[in-house]
Amino acid sequence: MRPERESFDVIVIGGGHAGCEAAAASARMGAATALVTHRFSTVGAMSCNPAIGGLGKGHLVREVDALDGLMGRVGDAGGIQFRVLNRRKGPAVRGPRAQADRKLYAAAMQAAIRETEGLSVIEGEADELIVVEGRVTGLRLADGREFGAGSIVVTTGTFLRGLIHLGEKNWPAGRVGEAPAMGLSSSFERAGFTLGRLKTGTPPRLDGTTIDWSAVEMQPGDEPPEPFSVMTDRITTPQIQCGITRTTAATHEVIRANVHRSPMYSGQIKSSGPRYCPSIEDKIVRFGDRDGHQIFLEPEGLDDSTVYPNGISTSLPEEVQLAILASIPGLERVKMVRPGYAIEYDHIDPRELDPTLQTKRLRGLFLAGQINGTTGYEEAAGQGIVAGLNAALAASGAALTVFDRADGYLGVMIDDLVTRGISEPYRMFTSRAEYRLTLRADNADQRLTEKGIALGCVRSARTLHHRTKMEALNAARTLSKSLTITPNEAIKHGLSLNRDGQRRSAFELMAYPDIGWSQVRAIWLELSAIDPVIATHLEIDAKYDVYLERQSADVEAFRRDEGLVLSEVDYQLVPGLSNEVRAKLEKARPFTVGQAGRIDGMTPAALGILAAYLRREARKTSKAIA
C-alpha cells in the first residue's frame, strides 16, 4: 500500500465513495494507481446517513457491483438492516437498501482498498494539478511532494473550499473535524474552470440510550435479507430494527420562531441545496400545511448507541435543535451527541465534461462525485467507477468508453450531468430513466458484467460466476419455453385461461398477472431443479417479455442517434443551422446527435440537419478512401 514510486498511471484524489471506486477500478484495469487522501483511517467514511441504496440509488449500487466495484460487497459486509423498497410495485422500480454499521462499512472498504493489487495509498493534502500544454501530468501535495501521472481523477466531495454553517457560526472544514481542500480550487480556476457553490446538510446525532423506544413505531428489515452483490451468498451480520416518529405542531412552532437564525434564511448561505433532501426548516416553510413530517431513527452501529434521525437535517443553532428534539415523540429527553450542520463547497459545471467524465478543458483529468454537482454515496460511486476505468484507459492510450442511457442508470446520470448541467445537487430517481423496464436492479449484471469483462475491470472470480449464472439462466429459459400445456390441462391444475385450444409454455404462462413460478413448478416437476435465484429472474423476464420487445425497438432507435458522433464537427460548416442553434451546439459540444437532442431548445429540424450532414460527410470519406 505504501508508494514505492514517484509516478503512477493514475492518481485518484479523495478517499470517499467516488474515490474508492475510481482507484479500485483503475487498479483492476492494470494501471499503477495511487489514492491520495488526508488520512487512510477516514477512507470509506459515511459522512451523512448510515445507509446504502434506495429508490434509484439501489440500481446504481447493483450496476457498480456488476462492474466488479466495491460498494455492493462492502454494503453487504456492513449492512445491519436490509429492505427492498417498493416491493409491492413492479421489479423495475424496486430499490434495494441497507442500513449500515458505520465502523463495519469503513473497515470493509479499507480492507478492500488494502487488498487491491496495484493500488498504493498516499496520505497528504492534494494542493495543485501539474499541467503541461493542456494536459495534466502530475500532482503536487501541500507538503511539497510531487507525483507524476498519466491521468488524474478528482473526487473531493464536500472538501473543495468546504465551509460548515451552524446557526450564526461558520468555519472552514471538509466535514466536521476535518480540514477542507483549499489549493485545488485555485488550481481549477487557474486552468479556466468556472466554479460554483452548492450546499448540503446533516441532522444532529442522538444518544440512542436516551430515546424512549416504546413511544415510536419499530420497523424491521426483510427476512431473509437480500444482498446487494451477486457475489454475496447470504448476509451473516446481526440485523436490527429502526424506529419511526414524526414532528409535531410544537416542533413546527419552534422552527417558525427561529427560522431567521437558519443560515439558509438569514442570507448567510446563498448556494442551492438538494431539492429532494431538504432541511427540516425548509420543509416547514415549503410545506407549512402538513401536520407532521416522518423521521426514521437509524442506529449507526451494532456496538454504537448513536442514532441518526433521518428527516431532520438542520443548521439551526444548537439550543434550537435541542428544543426541536424535545418536541418530538420518543425524543423528549434525548441527549444530542453532535448538532446538525450545513456545509457549502465548490463544484464544477458538469457540462465541462464529456460522457467519459474527462474534462474538455484538460486532457487526462477526470472528475467524479459531488464535484460534478451530485449528492449521495451511490451517485458518487457510480461516477467513480466510470471515471476510474476511463482514467486507466486514457493512461494506456486506449479508446475511452461511454455508458449510455440504454446501458444503465450510470449512463442516465452521466448523460443528465454532462448534457443538462445542474442548478442544485443531482439525485438519482427511477423516473429519470426512459428504459426503466430494461434497466432493473435485478438484471444489472446481465446488462453490464460482459461489458466490464471486455473492458478489463472485472476479475476472474466474478467472470466465472457470471458466465455460470448466465448458462443456468439460458438453460432455464430454454426449458421453460419447451414445456407446453393446453388450456384444458391448465384449468385442471387450477389456472384460469381462455379455452382457445392454444398450447402455452411455462414461460408464457408466467406472463399472466396471477400465475407465477410456484404454479408452473407444480405442473412440471423438472422445474424444481432450477435454482431459486434463476427462477426469480425467469419469472420477471416472463412478466415483462412483451413490453421488453417493444422497448427494444425504442432502444434501437436511440442507439442509431447515439452512433452519429459529433465530437469533431465544426458547426460553422453545417449549412441550414440557425445562429441560435449553432451557439447552443458550440457551447455544449455534444458527443452525439442523440445527446444534442437532449440540449434545451434543440429542434427536430436541427437534429435532422446534423444527421444528414454526418451521413454526407461519411459518404465523402468513403469515396475518398475508395
Curated annotation (Swiss-Prot):
> At which positions is NAD(+) bound?
273-287
Could you list the residue ranges that cross the membrane? none
Task: List required co-factors.
Answer: FAD
Q: What is its main location?
A: cytoplasm
Q: Mind telling me which SUPFAM superfamilies this protein's record contains?
A: FAD/NAD(P)-binding domain (SSF51905)
Keyword NAD, does the record have it? Answer: yes
Q: Which Gene3D superfamilies does the record associate with it?
A: FAD/NAD(P)-binding domain (3.50.50.60), GidA associated domain, C-terminal subdomain (1.10.150.570)
Q: Molecular function terms in GO for this entry?
A: flavin adenine dinucleotide binding
**Pfam families referenced in this protein's UniProt entry, alphabetically:** GIDA, GIDA_C_1st, SAM_GIDA_C
The places in or outside the cell where this protein is found are: Cytoplasm
The protein's superkingdom reads: Bacteria
Q: Which InterPro entries match?
A: FAD/NAD-bd_sf (IPR036188), GIDA_C_N (IPR049312), MnmG (IPR004416), MnmG-rel (IPR002218), MnmG-rel_CS (IPR020595), MnmG_C (IPR026904), MnmG_C_subdom (IPR047001), MnmG_C_subdom_sf (IPR044920)
Going by the UniProt record, its keywords in alphabetical order are:
Cytoplasm, FAD, Flavoprotein, NAD, tRNA processing
Ligand binding (FAD): G14, G15, G16, H17, A18, G19
Q: Which GO terms describe its biological process?
A: tRNA methylation; tRNA wobble uridine modification
* UniProt KW NAD keyword: yes
Annotated Gene Ontology cellular component terms = cytosol
Per the entry, what this protein does is: NAD-binding protein involved in the addition of a carboxymethylaminomethyl (cmnm) group at the wobble position (U34) of certain tRNAs, forming tRNA-cmnm(5)s(2)U34.
Question: Which PANTHER family does its entry note?
Answer: GLUCOSE INHIBITED DIVISION PROTEIN A, PROTEIN MTO1 HOMOLOG, MITOCHONDRIAL
Family that this chain belongs to:
Belongs to the MnmG family.
Q: How does it assemble?
A: Homodimer. Heterotetramer of two MnmE and two MnmG subunits.
Instruction: State the protein's name.
Output: tRNA uridine 5-carboxymethylaminomethyl modification enzyme MnmG
Organism, by scientific name, is: Bradyrhizobium diazoefficiens (strain JCM 10833 / BCRC 13528 / IAM 13628 / NBRC 14792 / USDA 110)
Q: Which gene encodes it?
A: mnmG
